[in-house]
UniProtKB/Swiss-Prot annotation:
Biological process, per Gene Ontology: lactate metabolic process; malate metabolic process; response to cobalt ion; response to manganese ion; response to zinc ion; tartrate metabolic process
Protein's gene: D2hgdh
Keywords: FAD, Flavoprotein, Metal-binding, Mitochondrion, Oxidoreductase, Transit peptide, Zinc
Residues recorded with modification N6-succinyllysine: K115
Swiss-Prot/TrEMBL cofactor(s): FAD
Main location: mitochondrion
GO cellular component: mitochondrion
Function, in words: Catalyzes the oxidation of D-2-hydroxyglutarate (D-2-HG) to alpha-ketoglutarate. Also catalyzes the oxidation of other D-2-hydroxyacids, such as D-malate (D-MAL) and D-lactate (D-LAC). Exhibits high activities towards D-2-HG and D-MAL but a very weak activity towards D-LAC.
Species the sequence originates in: Rattus norvegicus (Rat)
Protein name: D-2-hydroxyglutarate dehydrogenase, mitochondrial
Amino acid sequence: MVLHLVPRWSASLFRASPRWKKTYSQRASAQLKWLGCPRSVYSPLACRAYSKVSGSPEVMLTPERYPVQRLPFSTVSEEDLAAFECIIPGRVITDPEQLQTCNVDWLRTVRGCSKVLLRPQTSEEVSQILRHCYKRNLAVNPQGGNTGMVGGSVPVFDEVILSTALMNQVISFHDVSGILVCQAGCVLEELSRYVQERDFIMPLDLGAKGSCHIGGNVATNAGGLRFLRYGSLRGTVLGLEVVLADGTILNCLTSLRKDNTGYDLKQMFIGSEGTLGVITAVSIVCPPRPKAVNVAFLGCPGFTEVLQTFRTCKGQLGEILSAFEFMDAECMQLVGQHLHLTNPVQESPFYVLVETSGSSAGHDAEKLTNVLEQVLNSGLVIDGTMATDQRKVQMLWALRERITEALSRDGYVFKYDLSLPVERLYDLVIDLRTRLGPRAKHVVGYGHLGDGNLHLNVTAEAFSQELLGALEPYVYAWTAEQRGSVSAEHGLGFKKKNVLGYSKPPVAVKLMQQLKAMLDPKGILNPYKTLPARA
């Protein structure tokens, strides 16, 4: 059976019937009119207004909501401001309006009260700033695009905010090896555009790519949508330049694919969330840009069918399978309710997004078509749509990428980023719906099925200590029973630092604390984050 391509919609909608439809219906065409903007425009962090509703109440200060005590750091004085002005003239920000954005996380769940924002442009300037802060015992909050989900990128109290926003230069790119060297403040989407013009892609893709910085991505060991194909940043990052707490510049900015000399120091800083040093430059290997990308968006009757569809795709698509995402019906409902996006397929209990990327358009499309025919005819899939045109591919991805934005409009969001055995991935969502009942507006699950990553979200009208108590530590204990991880890709930040023990043994936690004490004896780098306080 041959799937005929149609103009501008590279593959037809297919229905749960004996034969494929050769063209998409007028109904489907009308539904897809919203799919006209670039994928980046729909990034929840490219459009800050989505999460900062005009007239919304001020975010509660973090110490008022969470039981945390300020450590005995110094406070910023006029002399400190003068010293900073000498280091970075004209880039010391004390204006309250400008500071407001940097003191609040984009989810509007935590807020610090820093009185100064520093915007260095070079590693040497970062070094001088940290040297001064170390001498004065001033706590420092490194900040990239402020797109984190766990409160790791904003101050808890009055820490000095050290922004990498002006450290946004590409240092070098090699068009044979695909190795990119750049400053830490480069925005991921801009880097993606830069390397795509040279026929490469970034190994990392996130819904927040319009705002997040590559340095922050590395500092949090971000996973994202291409993890299934290209793996984690621990494998694609070749080298780092890092400024330590006392101002020492550690230059491990190698561009070598192989270097087996001594300890691999960069790995300490990948995922350290700015607690061991400030990443100022990154060397990363970029894969060649695929010649052909196909995306299918499918409706499945149950989670068992989602798993079986994944197994079929993984077995038959092999190396060209680059993403396998899932979302439940409530996710689709919220995307429609709050963002007015239309479901392009028949309503289903679950939805799956399958992406392939390879070097042969005809071969890849044929392989995907054959797989889709198989899952449709076997009843694993109720309905679906497929695209090979780049614009339409971006349109289908918007359904998945904008879930976070839709949730942020539904009220206060309790967010959990969990690694679980794939076969148990959705059980916790079902369990919590029963456990929470009407106390929660919505309990939804979506994420990267290909790597066992569940994004569990619970929405409520407002923050509730009672609801939080029903969720925690229950969610973490449940995850630990499955030998899962309490943080798959978002990091621990401020909100999850005290639950590290659910995923790591005491010996490992103690060793991490000792490493922190060795590299940052005064504890000035991103305090109150990532690690529980030492006893």
